[in-house]
Every structure is written in structure tokens, then in C-alpha cells.
């Protein structure tokens, strides 16, 4: 499983659809393979929510099972202030040059993740013929007409995979803070070498469980980008990955 291919959903109230319902184009859940969404900021804003074309025989639904998985985001911030002597400080001790630097260092690392004991991945590999039929559906066609850009370009995203958390999961938030004063004084002694004593650093970590969900739900989706520029005669399809 490649985490970069999966986009976590912020909500936990999306019950998973069954495989037969997805194959027939009438999924029993609000988020399904075959759904079309407008952009990466609105992962649950389904355009063709009333249904879609049934999957052809050559578009089977593949499954994979994983244990002990987690998805989440990390937000790092770092603040450093440093001062350094502009030139070696001479003549404090005859024959010894002294250099120095000192500063403040503060870091804050926040982790917001979901942990799952068991997840099941459902995925399809859509054909161009099938996507052509999806794009001709009433809701998708109307959206494309309204959202066309300069020279007639447009873009939508198709859900090609869903990840289902079996038995729910835990939302864990942890924060690590570090702060300290650092500094060193360097001594250059002819014939002996250099010495540079330094001071230390302190970190604190705090972890808490924000929520514990106990029923199956769709926790992430996999997407392909379907786009057409005004200079091309046909649309293109590209797998989408998250940026970390």
C-alpha cells in the first residue's frame, strides 16, 4: 500500500458501499468507486451522487487487506535565533584565539493521525471507454460545462479506490515541543587544535486520543485526474498523489 496515493477523509460517518452495489452503479454508501468530485479540496462533494454507469466485465473490483495502518499529517515549525562573533577574540590568553556563537532554538511538531487495526482496500482500473460514458452522464456533463476555463479547458477527479477501516479507528494527536539555549566557545591553540564546549536541549511530548470510532467507515480514497486543455482534442488521465 502506497500512502501517497490515498487521500484521508476528515469525517467518519461514511459507511462503506458493498461491492455488488458499486458494480451496478448504485452504491449503498455516500462515497464510492465511480464517483466524480470537482477538486482535491472537496473530497466528499460528489457530482454524480445519483449513480453512475455500471462497471463493465473487464473492470473488476480488486481487494487487499492490511493490518495496523495509520494516516495523518505532520506540521513542523522551527524558530532559530543565532548570534556569532564577527571576528576571533584575541589576546584574552596569549597565543590563543577565541571564537563564539550563541542562540535560541524552538521547535514545535504536531501530529494528527488516525490509527486502524484493520483496513480493506477496494480498487478498480478504469478504461477510457468507461470514463467516456461517465463524462457523458447528465450531472458530470453539466458541471464540466459550467466550470470550463479559458479556451474550454476543464478538470474533474474520479474515485478509483476506497479504503475501509474495519472496526473503526482512533484519532491520535501528539505534540512535541523543544526549546533551549545553545552556544559554543571555540579555542584555537597553536600546536594543540580546537575545543568547543556546548550547552544542551530540552524536549517535551504530549499525546492524547481525540476520538474512537467503532464501526466500519470509508477513511480514505484514491483518485485519478481527468482533464482536458483547450489545445487538446481529447482528455487525459493521470494518477494523483499527495504532497508531503
From Swiss-Prot:
Main subcellular location: cytoplasm
Region (Disordered): 1-22
Keywords: Cell membrane, Cytoplasm, Membrane, Necrosis, Transmembrane, Transmembrane beta strand
Claim: Kinase is one of the keywords in the record: no
A GO-annotated cellular component: plasma membrane
GO MF terms, alphabetically ordered: protein heterodimerization activity; wide pore channel activity
Keyword Transferase: no
Topology in membrane: Multi-pass membrane protein
Subcellular compartments: Cytoplasm; Cell membrane
GO biological-process terms attached to the record: programmed cell death
Described purpose of this protein according to its UniProt entry: Gasdermin-like protein involved in heterokaryon incompatibility, a process that ensures that during spontaneous vegetative cell fusion, only compatible cells from the same colony survive (non-self-recognition). In N.crassa, the rcd-1 locus exists as 2 incompatible alleles, rcd-1-1 (AC Q7SBA0) and rcd-1-2 (this entry). During the allorecognition process, forms a heterooligomer with rcd-1-1, thereby forming a functional gasdermin-like complex that binds to membranes and forms pores, triggering cell death. Binds negatively charged phospholipids, such as cardiolipin and phosphatidylserine.
Family the entry assigns: Belongs to the gasdermin family.
Protein name listed in UniProt: Gasdermin-like protein rcd-1-2
Organism: Neurospora crassa
